[in-house]
Amino acid sequence: YIENNYSINSENVNIVSMRKGLMNGSYTYFNEAFKLIMNTSPNDADFSDLVHSKINIDNFFDYFIIQTYIQNGDWFAGRNNTKIWQAESSKWNYVLYDTDQSYSSNFDSINAISFARSPYKLSAEGDTIDYSSRNSKLFNHILNNNQLKCFFINRYTELINTIFHPSFFKEKLDSIKFKIEPIITDHFLRFPLDNFSYDDWIKNLDDYIQLNNE
């Protein structure tokens, strides 16, 4: 993915999974960047510049925006399906993947942004258990900076009014749904979910678009 999209040799890339740890290269650079950001107060005058120097902030915010907007149920634990990469001496970038559990009604009553900042799960007894990770801690810490928080809000608003706008979203869905029907059907055969079908999937997306339109 990185070689094909960024023309960077994989031997020169550090890849870290929030769940599995180091996947390629060295863990040192991520540890250093994470500790430096987390040990710096968001109120520090140089905090925003520090974050910009270590993280591709456009990629960072777009990643969290799309994950929270589509309510990815296979990501919300704060640890799952999260990978970041960095070419040597460059900024860290997030990779968006495994989003097939998105647009779930199970998350309709949850503030997705708050959940991403402070993820939790419920015990068998119904008690709330902290499920934060480096991923969620970093996101929360960065949003505690007013300048970066405003940047995030403005970017979220921009995307909601453009590519996430219901009319645009519906147009794109209608343009591809028949092309990808064989792939989606095969996906549900390989990973069955309570007899969930292609038609159910389309209806789920249509309902979600309508809900956002309201």
What do the predicted segments below correspond to?
Residues 1-24, 28:
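Conserved ATP-binding subdomain of kinase catalytic cores across diverse folds
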Residues 21, 26-214:
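Middle-to-C-terminal accessory/interaction subdomains
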